[in-house]
Amino acid sequence: MKQIFALCLVLCSLTAQGQDDVLSAARQTNDYFMKKYSDPTQPTNVKKIRPSSLWTRAVYYEGLMALYGIDPQQRYLDYTARWSDFHKWTPRNGTKTTDADDQCCEQTYIEYNLLTGKGSLDATKENLQKQMATDRIDYWTWIDAIQMAMPVYVKMYAITKDKSYLDYAMKSYRWTRNECGGGCFNKKEGLWWRDKDYVPPYKEKDGKNCYWSRGNGWVYAALVRSMNELPVKSKEYKELKKDFLLMSEALILCQHDDGFWHASLVSDADYPGPEMTGTALFLYGMAWGIRQGLLDEMYRPACDKAWQALRSCLHKDGFLGWNQGTGKDPSAGQPVTFTSVPDFEDYGTGCYLLGLSEYYKLLKK
């Protein structure tokens, strides 16, 4: 009995140490980011001036809210509130926008409002209702859009119980999945083509399909963020769950021995190096799937290896290496290295925080 008790103490100690390491890494890179971008109202300046409500920054705030969930520091909420207040709780380019990239910031508006009771969702509701009123479901012509916009609609359904939001999200998702370019989801291989330009006959140089890591990561994260808002017995949850499981089965086979996924999931013909953002998003999804009982323990070693890979991306000052710049395929931002600086670094930090926050919860399980 004493031996069993001692073993339990050792295991608990190892778990606590593992959690401490994960939280330390998350804090380190977030502190770096908040120090570098101390004024969240300032526009970004990458080749041109853009407001800080653009999608790259919005993804960062998704990660920050996830970090707050495991590390509830008031300064995270203050930073988020200052950003949201400055942008008047409105999507980029106003309430008439139908661009998913513009709508990504609304995910954080909703989460912050639910958490604190502060802020306004009036502009978000107006924006979504205007888009639904067009009776078009073909706006999401690239798979990144599924992550940027789908969770907004599903979250709005969850708080209003207005089924029209969920119906619109599902119809739009099915259009991208089954019809855009003949269908962006390859059901046989469980992976997504980024948009109609990458559907066959387009191939990588070695003749393999072009499956972009971060693009698939966006969809994987969107499935998590949407299912997380839905009743598990609902038909919509079950529909998304099927795709989540298909993707999980495919993705675990694409992970490399060092824990990374590469920019191209199935082809190393041109870009064989590690890539951080896709790796972080896949960790986010797999850790969540295990915690929800959707994925079995076979996926746990993949999560552990992914954490070690992500840990190796972290510089001493909090900068993240192996972060592929913006683009739409494996060639974007190359060469991607430990020291290369991407055009935008905010979305990469957001992906990192999402992955580590969910892995932290898995360790606590």
Where are these regions (language model features)?
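Extended ligand-binding clefts on enzyme/binding-domain cores
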Residues: 143-144, 154-265, 272-283, 295-327, ...
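"A position-specific structural signal for the A-helix of alpha-solenoid helical repeats
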Residues: 63, 108, 152-155, 285
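CBM-like carbohydrate-recognition segments
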Residues: 7, 20-58, 66, 70-86, ...
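Short secondary-structure capping/junction motifs at helix and strand boundaries
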Residues: 2-4, 116-125, 136, 163-167
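Bacterial Sec-dependent N-terminal signal peptides
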Residues: 1-20
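Helix-capping and short linker residues that terminate individual alpha-solenoid repeat units
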Residues: 38, 72, 88-92, 117, ...
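Hydrophobic/aromatic side-chain positions at a characteristic register within alpha-helices
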Residues: 72, 110-113, 154-161
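Asp-box/WD-like beta-propeller blade repeats and closely related beta-sheet repeat scaffolds
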Residues: 120-153
